[in-house]
A protein has these predicted regions:
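Conserved phosphate/anionic-ligand binding catalytic regions in large, soluble enzymes, centered on
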Residues: 8-26, 277-296, 337-347
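Accessory carbohydrate-recognition regions in carbohydrate-active enzymes
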Residues: 12-55, 122, 152
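Alpha-helical support elements that line or immediately flank enzyme active sites
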Residues: 17-34, 294-306, 351-359
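Short, mixed-charge aromatic SLiMs
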Residues: 44-57, 89-97, 241, 315-328, ...
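C-terminal regulatory domains involved in ligand/effector binding and gene-expression control
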Residues: 75-253
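Accessory "access/gating" subregions that flank catalytic or transport cores
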Residues: 203-338, 446-454
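Hydrophobic alpha-helical bundle architecture
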Residues: 307, 318, 324-397, 409-418
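Extended hydrophobic packing segments that form well-structured cores
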Residues: 418-454
Length: 454
């Protein structure tokens, strides 16, 4: 069973698979060098980036992330404001300080980072890091960034962790999850909480989710109050702050029954604009889709009742359980299954989390999740200029409203649904595998080739 902690990770924008994962890989590589006693002998490092990681890597800051990882940084604690100056120094001097300054090595601007368009066999997002001592290659490793900030090296690809802790309710499908809920009389969040308590202490769980919600709120707040143009060739203007001013200033809007939709849009836009700017965000389950889970919880906070720790913990546990089902049985990588694995999964998770808070039965929670995904099936990932901006930012807003609608439809339904959550997860994965690679985060088709940068 995947811990819910793994579904919500504090990190850095703009991409979990192309920024967070590669930074973790770089850090893991230098940690290995230290552990093996090789670090002080290293004189040069080089990186090869493959497949989708290469094709959209520049727009997703993959190169910057790997360099920051090799320098000894982690996505959740890296000083975001210090990154540009550090990268400028590396580019200017062709030298890189590894492992928090322990050793300085050659990292030439022309071939320190090589972008290769071919795929490696195991996954669309692959990278190899090499370390030399003089002319001798002393260490080399292949990493795959499999979505949501998860990384795995070649030896462990597709293998279960051997030291997995036994949990009381080890569900691998929605049917099993519902079976345990029936057996115990527990809600989805209650049942998942019992699993988490086998992995972490109660205090750790409370502290972890307090930090997740606090990071999400801070991100919404920054996004709502920051103006200007997002980085990159598209020159996309931020929209959340102007929308906030409009909503706060206009009396006329307060009589509009659709007013709440504007607020939900604003929450989601705020988060995804921060992500696009390389800010501090929470993967939920990825960065490309990181606005949906917080926007729906912010909606609950503003329009239903103030969110307390008990409320946000229930929400994250239910949403995270659904995310874990997609992670175990399909994919949360846009490079593997298109945007249905990112925005589709986030919509499904948020719908389930909201249904849980609104008092849904375990069946209704799964129906909400199913509706949230069913109407994102076939969604392509075709980011313009390889950046997490168009169509990604606006798409998070649309999917946040869709998640709220999905949970309402699930709870108002009186007939039996024809499509189960397990079937829709299976369908999403097969649809993604059938999808032309042009539509799986390669920026070689769709909007990516129709929309011109100025």
């Amino acid at each position: 069973v995947i811990s819910i902690f793994d579904m919500f990770k504090v990190g850095i924008g703009p991409s979990s698979s192309h920024t967070v994962g590669p930074m973790k890989a770089g850090k893991q590589f230098v940690d290995d060098l230290v552990e093996k006693g090789l670090i002080d002998d290293v004189t040069r490092v080089a990186v090869d980036v493959y497949g989708s990681l290469s094709l959209t890597g520049k727009g997703h800051h993959t190169d910057i992330a790997i360099i920051m990882g090799l320098a000894g940084n982690q996505p959740d604690t890296v000083d975001i404001d210090a990154i540009p100056a550090f990268i400028r120094d590396v580019e200017t001097r062709g030298r890189l300080l590894l492992a928090k300054g322990r050793v300085e090595v050659d990292f030439p601007a022309n071939d320190g980072m090589r972008f290769r368009s071919e795929n490696l066999s195991l996954h669309e997002n692959a990278m190899q890091i090499h370390a030399w001592a003089g002319e001798t290659l002393v260490y080399s490793k292949t990493y795959y960034s499999i979505g949501g900030g998860f990384i795995v090296d070649e030896e462990h690809f597709g293998k279960e962790a051997s030291n997995a802790v036994q949990v009381p309710y080890p569900f691998a499908s929605a049917a099993e999850l519902l079976g345990y809920c029936h057996e115990t009389g527990l809600s989805v969040s209650g049942m998942v909480m019992q699993n988490e308590l086998a992995l972490h202490s109660k205090q750790e769980i409370e502290d972890y989710f307090a930090n997740v919600w606090q990071t999400m709120q801070a991100c919404i707040d920054r996004g709502m109050n920051t103006e200007g143009i997002l980085p990159g060739p598209l020159r996309v203007p931020r929209r959340a702050s102007a929308l906030r001013r409009l909503l706060v200033a206009s009396d006329k809007l307060s009589h509009d029954p659709m007013n709440v939709v504007d607020w939900v849009n604003m929450f989601a836009l705020a988060v995804n604009e921060e992500n696009a700017a390389g800010g501090r965000v929470v993967t939920a389950p990825t960065n490309g889709a990181c606005g949906i889970v917080p926007a729906v919880l912010a909606y609950y906070d503003h329009f239903i009742e103030p969110v307390t720790p008990e409320i946000y913990i229930r929400y994250f546990l239910a949403a995270g359980a659904i995310g874990a089902l997609y992670k175990m049985n399909a994919s949360i990588s846009g490079a593997e299954v298109g945007c249905q694995g990112e925005v589709g999964v986030a919509c499904s998770m948020a719908a389930a989390g909201l249904a849980e808070l609104l008092g849904a039965s375990p069946e209704q929670v799964c129906v909400a999740a199913e509706i949230g995904m069913e109407h994102n099936l076939g969604l392509t990932c075709d980011p313009v200029a390889g950046q997490v901006q168009v169509p990604c930012i606006e798409r998070n807003a649309i999917a946040s409203v869709k998640a709220i609608n999905a949970s309402r439809m699930a709870m108002r339904r009186t007939s039996e649904p024809r499509v189960s959550l397990d079937k829709v997860i299976e369908t999403m994965y097969e649809t993604g595998k059938d999808m032309n690679a042009k539509y799986r985060e390669t920026s070689r088709g769709g909007l990516a080739i129709k929309v011109q940068c100025d």
